[in-house]
Amino acid sequence: MTVLTDKIAVVTGAGSGIGEAIATLLHEEGAKVVLAGRNKDKLQNVANQLAQDSVKVVPTDVTKKEEVDELIKMAQQTFGGLDIVINSAGQMLSSKITDYQVDEWDSMIDVNIKGTLYTAKAALPTMLEQSSGHLINIASISGFEVTKSSTIYSATKAAVHTITQGLEKELAKTGVKVTSISPGMVDTAITATYNPTDRKKLEPQDIAEAVLYALTQPKHVNVNEITVRPV
């Protein structure tokens, strides 16, 4: 028997990159997976590689709380419960304050911060009612290490880390777990234009394995934070 048999998982940002790798691994380990993201075609491409009776595609814009609420409801209606929510949707755009790209700042704040909060708001009532569940937020090393071109992005990922820390304290002794995972540079379409040629990258699968590690600890153990760096 696989380790997540019949667990019900929602993964945002599941159409590509880290989210796709997480969704695929959870499905391989027996979970029923709801794939969420903006691009329906990309989500469907991922779903087509998985067993159709244990996957559901729900196009979702995480910056719209009504859509996130509907995503969580759809997961429960389709599979009869909610055990795992992975906040993997993220955005990395121009981040220098002195570039004055306010629209891009707003977009990152909406996706990276508000999206994380909206998903927690939608999922936690069910998890608290059943005294179980696991919320995992994908943050970033950039939340701790700021470069001259990453200021706004780093600030949003630092916020994701802080949100997770606060939730860990709020949810203590409730049976609901929360984890923050902070990867270094990961080889995805998003990072392709940002990465210096001499900088090592992680693979999306590496982050998926970190998620699985957090999810498969004993019931009395909560992994609060994981940092993943390339060697």
Curated annotation (Swiss-Prot):
Swiss-Prot/TrEMBL keywords: Oxidoreductase
EC supergroup of this enzyme: oxidoreductase
Protein EC: 1.-.-.-
Residues that, per the record, bind NADP(+): 10-34
Residues reported to bind substrate: S140
Highest taxon of the lineage: Bacteria
Protein name stated in the entry: Uncharacterized oxidoreductase SAR2567
